[in-house]
């Protein structure tokens, strides 16, 4: 059996793809894979922040098209890059074991959010990260920083930026236990991560039941439950990358969910916790609370 796998061609994308394929191989040892590399709009446009490009699903549409056109059997993505609604005819069908979902502050000097010097230049092109940073440290300068993980790390190492905010998952997958920069975790209450961060997923045609069944066997159950809650939250808030909203679910050893969600704007932030058993209901409740907060912010302005 051979499965054609569409993915972006960056080093991190290929590492993430291999991670998910290893889970499939563990349940179906005889399966073979053919990698189909796809260039996306997000890969090609590097001189603008993502929210300024104005294309939804900037890292996923072209990759998923390879599946719809029959050029690949499945597409592999970082779940955080997928919009709440997939292209008709496609479904989410496989979930990797989750890497740490939180963001981190990287620097040469081992800075924390508290010890960053006044006026320090901090890089990120994420509206979410920028707004939460401004709420916590209004005295630092937030500047756009695009590029793959190596590029962003390199700009910190070269001194172009004093620090940058990035995903822990990408750094861990790329550098393992030997990163070239200091890494300080940011609590999810400080900077709530985007829904799906740390999870790698497969997207397939909804009629390919044989592949859906295989991916279900290979999926990490904890990641699938957390992803379900976070996707319900994402659908509920209905906001793209131009709004500073984050949300992350954590499955407890007792089997219940703890959901942390946040919104930031105008130098202020609001974070809420929701607890429950049903992933969809927990995600919807968190979205409802954040929607209420956004409305209050609008009324205040």
Swiss-Prot record:
State the UniProt keywords alphabetically: Porphyrin biosynthesis, Transferase
Sorted alphabetically, the Gene Ontology BP terms of this entry are: protoporphyrinogen IX biosynthetic process
**Catalytic activity, as annotated:** 4 porphobilinogen + H2O = hydroxymethylbilane + 4 NH4(+)
Q: Which cofactor does it need?
A: dipyrromethane
Q: What class of enzyme is it?
A: transferase
One GO CC annotation, please?
cytoplasm
Pfam families (UniProt xref): Porphobil_deam, Porphobil_deamC
**Which GO terms fall under molecular function for this chain's record?**
hydroxymethylbilane synthase activity
Q: What is the protein name for this chain?
A: Probable porphobilinogen deaminase
Q: From which source organism is this entry? A: Pyrobaculum islandicum (strain DSM 4184 / JCM 9189 / GEO3)
């Amino acid at each position: 059996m051979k499965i054609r796998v569409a993915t972006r061609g960056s080093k991190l994308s290929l590492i993430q793809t291999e991670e998910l394929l290893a889970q499939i191989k563990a349940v179906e040892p005889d399966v073979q894979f053919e990698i189909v590399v796809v260039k996306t709009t997000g890969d090609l446009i590097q001189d603008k922040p993502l929210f300024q490009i104005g294309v939804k699903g900037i890292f996923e549409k072209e990759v998923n098209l390879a599946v719809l056109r029959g050029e690949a059997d499945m597409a592999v993505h970082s779940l955080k890059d997928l919009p709440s609604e997939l292209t008709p005819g496609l479904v989410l069908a496989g979930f990797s074991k989750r890497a740490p979902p939180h963001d981190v502050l990287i620097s040469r000097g081992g800075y924390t959010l508290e010890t960053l010097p006044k006026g320090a230049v901090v890089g990120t092109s994420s509206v979410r990260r920028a707004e939460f940073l401004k709420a916590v440290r209004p005295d630092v300068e937030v500047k756009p920083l695009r590029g793959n993980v190596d590029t962003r790390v390199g700009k910190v190492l070269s001194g172009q930026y004093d620090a940058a905010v990035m995903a822990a998952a990408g750094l861990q997958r790329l550098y393992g236990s030997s990163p070239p920069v200091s890494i300080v975790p940011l609590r999810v209450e400080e900077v709530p991560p985007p829904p799906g961060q740390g999870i790698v997923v497969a997207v397939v045609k909804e009629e390919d039941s044989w592949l859906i069944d295989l991916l279900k066997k290979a999926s990490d159950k904890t990641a699938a439950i957390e992803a379900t809650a976070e996707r319900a939250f994402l659908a509920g808030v209905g906001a793209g990358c131009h709004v500073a909203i984050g949300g992350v679910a954590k499955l407890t050893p007792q089997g219940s969910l703890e959901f942390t969600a946040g919104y930031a704007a105008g130098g202020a932030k609001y974070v809420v916790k929701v607890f429950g058993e049903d992933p969809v209901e927990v995600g919807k409740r968190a979205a409802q609370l954040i929607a209420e907060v956004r409305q209050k912010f609008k009324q205040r302005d």
